[in-house]
Regions:
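Beta-rich carbohydrate-recognition and catalytic domains
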Residues: 1-47, 51-102, 109-158, 163-211, ...
Length: 252
């Protein structure tokens, strides 16, 4: 489902999510109770996040198959205000084979110094647990990136979503690998950081154990409350129905 939630105004939200109904990414306008109406769709891409750069450019980051290399890569492009069109698409240059499953779900965030950082899930081989890595843009344009050294988190955490990135005060949500289902269901977790590179993870899940929860996205309502949208599914292997859920994250 890979939802991405953004604020339009005090009454309206825009929600992007992968949808079988539109055979791509559905673009919906919603109220704050998440009553939504689809406005259109985006094709041949997945895992979209959109930020506004320091220069005031509305820039999206997403996964797409590169037909020239037959590999998946993270791309960036300039997006229209309504989120229904884009231009000037450019690959970031971190490709993987198209059948690499445990890779992707990039999350882009504008960091306090005006640069852009993109986080995504990575595996060193087909069997090891996932790791979270990142790259930071060379300039405020958010087009050319260099890998950040090391890992943000290891041991199977995935679907990283930064919900706050301020000087000395970072907050993020993430999910856990599906590899150990149903014994260990996918759940959401919370972490904090001072610089967005070294993270302190609270290892206690923040979602109920009996279901699986993943792909979180969110916006602040105020200093302590965040409106969260994510994907959820029964804690079983094989084909299963995926839905979007909404929740309020209340910080201590």
């Amino acid at each position: 489902m890979s939802p991405h939630l953004e604020k339009v105004d005090e009454k309206t939200l825009r929600l992007f999510y992968s949808s079988i109904k539109v055979k791509g990414i559905a673009v919906s306008l919603c109220d704050y109770q998440l009553n939504c109406e689809i406005q259109g769709s985006l094709q041949r891409m997945s895992d979209l996040t959109i930020i506004e750069t320091k220069d005031g450019v509305r820039r999206g980051y997403f996964v797409e198959l590169n037909p020239q290399t037959n590999q998946k890569d993270i791309f960036t492009a300039i997006f229209s205000e309504d989120g229904l069109s884009y231009s000037e698409k450019t690959p970031l240059g971190f490709p993987v084979d198209r059948d690499e499953i445990a890779w992707g779900v990039p999350d882009a965030v504008l960091i306090p110094n005006g640069l852009v950082r993109v986080y995504w899930t990575y595996t060193e081989d087909k069997t090891s647990d996932e790791k979270l890595i990142s790259a930071t843009s060379k300039t405020t344009k958010g087009i050319d990136f260099v890998m950040d050294p090391g890992y943000r988190l290891e041991n199977g955490y995935v679907d990283f979503e930064v919900i706050k990135a301020e000087e000395g005060d970072w907050k993020a949500l993430m999910s856990y690998t599906p590899h150990y289902m149903p014994e260990i269901p996918q759940s959401l977790f919370y972490a904090t950081s001072k610089d967005g590179l070294d993270w302190d993870l609270i290892e206690e899940r923040i979602t109920p154990k009996g279901y699986t929860y993943f792909d979180p996205t969110g916006i602040p309502i105020d200093e302590k409350n965040y409106l969260i949208v994510g994907s959820a599914a029964p804690n079983v292997m094989g084909d299963r129905e995926h839905l979007l859920f909404t929740a309020m994250l209340v910080l201590p």
